[in-house]
Amino acid sequence: EITTRLVGSEMCIRDSFNPLIGLINTGLSNGLTAISDAGYITVLGLILGAMMAIDMGGPINKAAYVFGTGVLATASQMIEKGAQPGDPAVQACYIAMAAIMVGGMVPPIGIALACQFFPKKFTKEERGSKVSNFVMGASFITEGAIPFAAADPLHVIPCTLIGAGVAGFLSALFKCTLMAPHGGIFVFATVGHPLLYILAWAVGSVITAVLLGLIKKDVK
């Protein structure tokens, strides 16, 4: 009976918040669309990259990802109607998706690098997860950074946000494109300007790691 009540309470709370989250996501999506329509593709890349690192799997992260899958669908529809893959409007869709993925790959990699080069900033348990974070980051699984963000949000989240934002900005600046909705390094063969894309990913990850090394306090 207690379990039933708890489950019922959880469902009520979740249902109460779902409309609010839906409104927020709709607002974010509309704002991102407006930026894209205005032609500010590098600004869009920066925002999308940063959104992937704010809550790492939460509503803001998911809003950015859903926007990305939505523009991929839009690109497919435009091509079906006669547009060419190289048309600017189609390319803008692929550029947005590339910025989203690189932004989501930065937090785990940046944290793993920080664990490697600034070990005094992390507990033994945290340092032990660096290999899994390398794997998760390379696979575009941002959630590997969540335990670190939960343990020290005031220091970790700003670092991952800045690094991911820079990566998204550079990816868009380099006009890197991605036609796949997921896959990490396993879909790099489909990325437009792959070497520049790797550079954007590396720069964002290093920025995250260095910032963590500078502002995170030593573990006692």
What kind of feature is each model-predicted range?
Residues 1, 48, 133-136:
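A generic hydrophobic-helix recognition signal that picks specific residues
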Residues 66, 77-91, 118, 122-128, ...:
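Transmembrane alpha-helical segments and their short flanking loops
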Residues 1-8, 12-13:
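Single conserved hydrophobic/aromatic residue that forms the stacking wall/gate
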Residues 15-131:
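Generic multipass alpha-helical transmembrane bundles of integral membrane proteins
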Residues 11, 59, 63, 156-160:
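Alpha-helical transmembrane segments and their helix-entry boundary regions
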